[in-house]
A protein has these predicted regions:
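Accessory carbohydrate-binding/adhesion or oligomerization-edge regions at the termini
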Residues: 746
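Formylglycine-dependent sulfatase
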Residues: 169-711, 715-716, 724-743
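Switch/connector loops and helix/strand junctions flanking conserved nucleotide-binding motifs
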Residues: 52, 132-135, 523
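Short juxtamembrane and helix-loop transition motifs at transmembrane-helix boundaries
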Residues: 47-55
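Cytosol/matrix-facing juxtamembrane amphipathic
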Residues: 3-28, 34-45, 100-168
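Short, low-complexity, glycine-enriched hydrophobic/amphipathic alpha-helices that associate
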Residues: 57-103
Length: 746
């Protein structure tokens, strides 16, 4: 197959003004995708023979991009002998020595020299051969033009020489902050005799064409909840992102909020970064301090130090409880994790009508609704995110951004306006058993689970739906209607944010990573759920009839989800939302607690269609993947402190290859004694002999210091390539494999 031909087009103009007008037309058409180029520059020569680069542009229609990539290549073509070092500053001067011979041998120098005369200007554009006619039309005011063609092999030597010449202007991005640049020019007694170095001015710059990144995280949601993964909740935005890109059906999290968030933002295992439990309850042992080690810089910090602007919005849950408030210490707050701006709540849960809002390093209190309307956090969260994006673009048209959007949904309390819950009236009347079966069948139909997958059994502790009284069914069905409406509203607001990215024309070059859950669906509502989740925290269990009697004071069961309630649903609904797996939140031992939906899109690079990827992936893989996709290395030194390598493995290799061998082959899981080890498809696990929500004094004493012996826990064994849902325990058949994996865990 013949090499694709590259054309370098040189257009001569009688004045700089005429050239500038055509250059602007070209860049506008490139940005509008009417024509494609690799790079373009405008060079002028005044009456005294002084030569200077006036304008530069890249393949995205961005102007003033400096000397990187194709722009630097064109500067190199023109630099010797037409451009002296004093004309283009240190960057051009660096190119002259190494690049000159290659450029002259190519014959391109003669073409440029003939076009550029005193008092005139030239526009030089580089493009693929099939774009030449469109570029010539855009540069239609030129008095003359000539084109030189070279194939990819022919210009490789030129570009290699340019890259070597430009090397001294490429910072070491493994050391952060990037050290101040040394002045690359020369200072004489006058400006005219001095060598300029404009490269010192902009500060850290992201790699050429670096994409934006939008990372969305839903809270306390399960594998079998969203319609995109076969569940009963409408998720059109999750569908939209899936259809633009890829679906990952073996993405894993830790089984609890804070540990997953720490793993997600650092690319490291949760114990390595001090978050073995939730942030509110740090402990006096390594791995449980609730404090991020300075040797584990989060990837938002890496982005921010490399030319990105970073914003975090929504639920945080990574600040220890004792650090809340005006005394800090603020190195435990979001800005210290690499965010230039934060708006949201620091705690692990909040009412959606009355959150305590923190902005940057200041707690600003509980917002009020406008015009007599109730305040609703999900709407304001999205408004604030969009306002930030607009503000970033109003100041800087080109700087790439990273936006972390973390909802309070679907963590209890399940707050949502009644009209959203009413969309699901009657849809769950047949109960959680029917929901699981229906979801499982849709998952097989969609290809989310393999056709030979087994639906795991309902735990004996959970009541069968058909065994319930009418009073119980009345309460429980409304609990699920409220939860579904709450969840769909969150997806709707994610859609508003993606629409805003599209409206500013940046969706094509934005990586969208949408994760439906930081752990499995929450079973903390106990067997009965509650009209007010604080009953759980205080060890109070109210029977359904008692709950119905109490909520009659506030408008009856239809009031669930309103400002007068703080509801959570019954644990069997969480189990249903984790279909087809066992258990849920807090249970690191089983996939119901650790496997969640993820979809990824990047229109500029990922082929649309929702193709499924089944390689093992984990929250710690997100950071390494983002860094690889945007063209940045891991940091090795931050603030003078040597960094621990990220534990995660980039899954960028899966974007274009559904059948690629998985590279993340070993991973441990552990939360509150519930634990598992994954290795080469095998999964060994053990859980405490208790229900996740059982914090009674008797149970706490049974598992307290001196009483609990982890060696007595019963381990299970699964081979996931043949058992997607973790349904068949092989511990008795393969005891040697189980012992081998237990040793790997410890």
């Amino acid at each position: 197959m013949a090499d694709q031909v590259t054309t370098v087009l040189v257009c001569a103009y009688p004045t700089v003004e005429t050239a500038d007008s055509d250059f602007e037309t070209l860049m506008s058409q490139v940005k509008g995708k009417q024509v494609g180029i690799q790079a373009a520059i405008l060079i002028s020569q005044d009456a005294d023979g002084e030569v200077a680069v006036q304008r530069t542009g890249d393949n995205l229609g961005r102007k003033g991009m400096g000397w990187g990539g194709g722009v630097g290549f064109l500067v190199g073509l023109a630099a010797p002998p037409l451009l002296a070092a004093t004309a283009v500053g240190a960057a051009g001067g660096a190119i002259v020595g190494k690049f000159a011979d290659r450029r002259i041998q190519s014959g391109l120098g003669d073409t440029i020299g003939e076009a550029l005369k005193p008092g005139t200007a030239v526009v030089i554009a580089m493009m693929d051969e099939d774009q030449q006619m469109g570029v010539e039309r855009a540069l239609g005011s030129a008095l003359g033009r000539s084109a030189v063609e070279t194939d990819k092999t022919g210009d490789a030597a030129l570009k290699d020489s340019l890259a070597e010449a430009m090397g001294k202007f490429s910072p070491d991005r493994t050391v952060l902050p990037i050290p101040d640049r040394n002045f690359g020019g020369a200072v004489d007694r006058t400006i005219g005799r001095s060598v300029l170095d404009w490269s010192m001015i902009p500060g850290p710059k992201a790699p050429d064409d670096a994409p934006n990144v939008l990372l969305v995280l839903i809270d306390d949601a399960g594998f079998g909840g969203p319609g995109t993964f076969g569940g009963g909740i409408n998720t059109p935005t999750l569908d939209r992102v899936k259809d633009m890109g890829l679906t990952y059906n073996r993405f894993h999290v830790t089984a609890v909020c804070s540990p997953t968030r720490a793993a997600l933002l650092t690319g490291r295992n949760h114990h390595r970064v001090g978050m073995g439990g939730i942030a509110e309850f740090p402990g006096p042992y390594p791995g449980y301090t609730g404090q991020l080690p300075r040797s584990c810089a989060p990837f938002p910090r890496v982005l921010a130090e490399n030319g990105y602007v970073t914003g975090g919005f929504g639920k945080w849950h990574l600040t220890p409880g004792q650090a809340f408030g005006p005394a800090g210490p603020f190195q435990r707050w979001p800005l210290a994790w690499g965010f230039n701006h934060f708006w949201g709540f620091l705690s692990g849960a909040s009412g959606q009508y009355d959150p305590v809002i923190t902005q940057d390093n200041t707690t600003i209190g509980v917002p009020q609704g406008k015009d007599g309307e109730s305040y609703f956090f999900p709407d304001d969260l999205t408004d604030k995110s969009i306002e930030w994006l607009h503000g970033v673009r109003a100041q800087n048209k080109e700087k790439p951004w990273f936006l972390y959007y973390s909802t309070g949904c679907s963590h209890a309390p399940h707050h949502v306006p009644k009209e959203w819950a009413d969309k699901y009236k009657g849809k769950f009347d047949d109960g959680w058993d029917a929901y699981r079966q229906r979801t499982f069948e849709r998952q097989i139909e969609l290809g989310i689970v393999p056709p030979d997958t087994e639906l795991t059994e309902r735990p004996e502790a959970y009541a069968a739906w058909d065994s319930l009284s009418e009073a119980e069914k009345t309460l429980y069905r409304r609990q699920m209607e409220v939860f579904a409406g709450f969840s769909e509203n969150a997806d709707y607001n994610v859609g508003r944010l993606i629409d805003a990215v599209d409206e500013i024309g940046e969706l094509d070059n934005t990586i969208v990573i949408y994760i439906w859950g930081d752990n499995g669906a929450s079973m903390e509502g106990t067997f009965t759920g509650s009209f007010n989740e604080t009953t759980f925290f205080n060890g109070v269990v109210l029977e359904p009839a008692e709950q119905l009697e109490i909520i009659e004071r506030f408008g009856g069961v239809e009031a669930l989800g309103s400002e007068h309630t703080a509801p959570h649903y019954a644990a069997p609904w969480a189990h249903a939302n984790n279909t087809p797996f066992q258990w849920g939140k807090q249970m690191a031992s089983h996939l119901g607690g650790t496997r969640d939906p993820m979809v990824i899109a990047w229109p500029n690079r990922i082929e649309a269609g929702g193709s499924i990827r089944s390689q093992f992936t984990h929250a710690i893989d997100i950071g390494p993947t983002i860094l690889e996709l945007v063209g940045l290395p891991e940091a090795e030194m931050v603030d003078g402190i040597e960094q621990q390598p990220m534990d995660g493995t980039s899954f960028a290799y899966t974007l274009a290859d559904a059948d690629a061998d998985e590279r993340h082959t070993v991973q441990y899981f552990e939360n509150y004694g519930s634990r598992a080890i994954y290795k080469d498809g095998w999964w060994a696990c053990a859980k405490l002999d208790k229900l996740p929500w059982d914090f009674t004094p008797e149970t706490l004493n049974r598992f307290g210091p001196g009483n609990y012996n982890p060696e007595e826990d019963v381990w299970e064994l699964y081979y996931l390539p043949d058992d997607f849902s973790q349904a068949n325990n092989l511990a008795d058949q393969q005891p040697e494999k189980l012992e081998e994996l237990k040793e790997v865990f410890w």
